[in-house]
Amino acid sequence: MRAHLITYGCQMNEYDTHLVESQLVSFGADIVSSVDEADFVLINTCAVRGKPVDKVRSLLGDLRKQKAQRPLVVGMMGCLAQLEEGQQIARKFEVDVLLGPGSLLDIGKALETNERFWGLQFKDELHGHIPPPPQGKLQAHLTIMRGCDHHCTYCIVPTTRGPQVSRHPDDILRELDLLLAAGVQEVTLLGQNVNAYGVDQGARLAGYPSFANLLRLVGRSGIRRVKFTTSHPMNFTEDVAAAMAETPAVCEYVHLPVQSGSNRVLRRMAREYTREKYLSHIAEIRRHLPDVVLATDIIVGFPGETEEDFQETLSLYDEVGYDAAYMFIYSARPGTPSYKHFADLPREVKTERLQRLIAKQKEWSARKNAAKVGTIQEVLLRGDAHDAHFLEGHTRGNHPTVVPKAAGASGPGIYRARIEHATPHMLYGRLIGEDGQDLPELPRFNPEAAGLSHPLQMV
């Protein structure tokens, strides 16, 4: 079998794709890089917004045409597969294999049968499963929990991924040991609400540490860098900020979604906190981590959002001064309370507000990134940038960074760089040695001769 996997959505989907891919390899499958090479195509889907659902529909339409011309098995997994909406799509486009987020380990059973296979149960065996580590990568994801116990009115995740189930700490640490042995230097702990780790359906689990203490455990493992996502403000405790401050491996980066700056909108979203409570968390974080890099999620145009509500979101952005933000127009998802009970705003209103928020974000990102010029940053470089004479990666604070290759630093690794230029979306620097001096840059070839039409410029 030649299998090709396509992933839409979040980092948890990326982790799940790796899990299923490793299962396929264990069954003897070859993983190929394109649909044309494959006789089995598996799509890992996202259902949080309408746009990725539309992409899946389009892709399945193309694959159905290919099925009419050659032997091809088509599978769909992930959040959309768990929904009636996704199951209707699967029927329409003649999908052969359908796996929900809780039935990923059924992939072998699905491929053994000669008829259509649907696996949509939430199975306990998934939580103890430890996939083999990715090979040749410095970064890896590590799922510490699945599902969510919150019920935000706009969110389909509790339906698609089920109630929260925390993985046993022994399984987490065993998987971490495998990642370390494979050369991973940065791990991101994943969950819908990592701060609630160890408290499932409101009950503290015996033998499970708090998330703050899990951070301390992971930070003492020998891993070079630790990050985590996503956090819910309702469950963020000051002890998490304290654990970050006292654990050198944990990066000074917090992604804390706010969604709106208006208490009225937050109530309609059922977010369970107020603007004031959220700002108190920000103050706690900065008390322990004065140089913390802060990112957030914001939904624009939630049903009933007035111009006054939106102005409160803009003012919150200024009050916090985020380094980065993931900003989205509200997307009504069938099956959610907001879809059932609230009337949507006109598309043009939502789009105009999003443009104003993006302008605000660019202003703050430019200001924050400019402050990094002249500083020394630890950067994890993944590999070649668009111009192969440069390396790309990110700082401990998740800033995308580009540097020219230098003697002793021409490939992936963690290095130190002096930042010399910044844009709202990128830092540019030069690699330095332990003595603080610039490392000699490697000779550069003519970009045209190398076939590079858009070399990155260091300015």
Swiss-Prot record:
Gene3D superfamilies recorded? Methylthiotransferase, N-terminal domain, tm_1862 like domain
Cofactor stoichiometry and binding?
Answer: Binds 2 [4Fe-4S] clusters. One cluster is coordinated with 3 cysteines and an exchangeable S-adenosyl-L-methionine.
The record ties this protein, via CDD domains, to: Radical_SAM
Where along the chain is [4Fe-4S] cluster 1 bound? C10, C46, C79
UniProt-annotated location(s) = Cytoplasm
Q: Which cofactor does it need?
A: [4Fe-4S] cluster
Keyword Glycosyltransferase assigned to the entry: answer is: no
Q: Which reaction does it catalyse?
A: N(6)-dimethylallyladenosine(37) in tRNA + (sulfur carrier)-SH + AH2 + 2 S-adenosyl-L-methionine = 2-methylsulfanyl-N(6)-dimethylallyladenosine(37) in tRNA + (sulfur carrier)-H + 5'-deoxyadenosine + L-methionine + A + S-adenosyl-L-homocysteine + 2 H(+)
Q: Known PANTHER family for this protein?
A: CDK5 REGULATORY SUBUNIT-ASSOCIATED PROTEIN 1 (PTHR43020), MITOCHONDRIAL TRNA METHYLTHIOTRANSFERASE CDK5RAP1 (PTHR43020:SF2)
Q: What is this protein called?
A: tRNA-2-methylthio-N(6)-dimethylallyladenosine synthase
| Originating organism | Deinococcus geothermalis (strain DSM 11300 / CIP 105573 / AG-3a)
High-level lineage: Bacteria, Thermotogati, Deinococcota, Deinococci, Deinococcales
